[in-house]
């Protein structure tokens, strides 16, 4: 199995277009080797020829330009991307679909909830149904794409930002709002969870002893953006666990015996993005990698 991290940042990327916090300043200046990051998405392949795109980032075109494996290979029109799978209806997971409207054949897979959101917004009709088939999937039921078995499962989260005003106060929404994904090629198994609000017993059992897990790294601490003065929202309010703290990711994974752990979907305010920070040192000491655009893992 081949996995390419196309984007590793949370919504808005790093640096976010209007952000001047310390972490973002370093990225603007590319000081001390600071890396800029696009919004989170990965591509996976069993053979290096046919690829499944996991979430369609607003930075889709930039990510393709940076990834030769996904360039057109033959004919006048071609893409190695044969399927797209969405783990939520968040803007940073669906907006890239609008950059895939040029009459290129691929299959689109999502929960019924997310497909309904797309159907309700006529802008997504730009995806010509003659070329793009939309397929709802069932939770905890494997589907086979490009010789990979992909199993979506529910994790704690919330409704997309643009649906909050229509949620009636139920921000958690249905069990199809926020999903994780298990990817299996018959020899190796990977878990991709770019958004998660809490570690549950079911999730703990699923991840215990895993070979590779990509996990929500949005914020270092729950009140990070509040303390910086850039937002009144906590991580929990946004549907994300924080890395630090007694209920945080480092503590939750401490006994799970995961062979390789990678933080992804990292907010532009998060100090772990600074490779010289004590927070970055702490996650590295706990056995975590911090994803960056272009990271490639072969299993």
UniProtKB/Swiss-Prot annotation:
Which of UniProt's keywords are assigned here? PQQ biosynthesis, Transport
Which Pfam families does the entry mention? Lactamase_B_2
Q: Where is the signal peptide?
A: none
In terms of superkingdom, the source organism counts as Bacteria
Q: In which pathway does it act?
A: Cofactor biosynthesis; pyrroloquinoline quinone biosynthesis
InterPro entries from the UniProt entry? Metallo-B-lactamas, PQQ_synth_PqqB, RibonucZ/Hydroxyglut_hydro
Gene Ontology biological process terms in this record: pyrroloquinoline quinone biosynthetic process
For this entry, the protein name equals Coenzyme PQQ synthesis protein B
What gene codes for this chain? pqqB
């Amino acid at each position: 199995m081949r996995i390419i991290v196309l984007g590793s940042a949370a919504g808005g990327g790093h640096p976010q277009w209007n952000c001047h916090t310390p972490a973002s300043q370093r990225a603007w200046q590319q000081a001390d080797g600071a890396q800029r990051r696009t919004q989170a998405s990965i591509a996976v392949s069993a053979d290096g020829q046919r690829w499944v795109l996991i979430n369609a980032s607003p930075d889709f075109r930039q990510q393709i330009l940076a990834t030769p494996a996904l360039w057109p290979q033959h004919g006048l029109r071609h893409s190695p991307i044969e399927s797209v799978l969405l783990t939520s209806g968040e803007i940073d997971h669906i907006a890239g679909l609008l950059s895939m409207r040029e009459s290129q054949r691929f299959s689109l897979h999502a929960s019924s909830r997310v497909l309904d959101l797309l159907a309700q917004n006529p802008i997504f009709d730009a995806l010509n149904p003659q070329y793009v088939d939309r397929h709802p999937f069932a939770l905890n039921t494997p589907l086979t794409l490009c010789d990979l078995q992909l199993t979506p499962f529910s994790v704690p989260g919330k409704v997309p930002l643009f649906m909050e005003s229509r949620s009636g106060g139920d921000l958690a929404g249905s069990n199809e709002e926020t999903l994780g994904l298990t990817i299996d090629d018959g020899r190796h198994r990977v878990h991709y969870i770019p958004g998660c609000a809490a570690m549950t017993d079911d999730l703990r059992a699923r991840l215990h002893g895993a070979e590779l897990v990509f996990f929500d790294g949005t914020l270092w601490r729950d009140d990070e953006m509040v303390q910086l003065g850039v937002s009144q929202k906590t991580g929990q309010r946004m549907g994300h666990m924080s890395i630090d703290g007694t209920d945080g990711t480092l503590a939750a994974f401490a006994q799970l015996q995961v062979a390789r752990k990678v933080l992804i979907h990292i907010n532009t305010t998060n100090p772990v993005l600074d490779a010289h920070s004590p927070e970055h040192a702490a996650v590295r000491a706990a056995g975590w990698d911090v994803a960056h655009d272009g990271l490639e893992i072969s299993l």
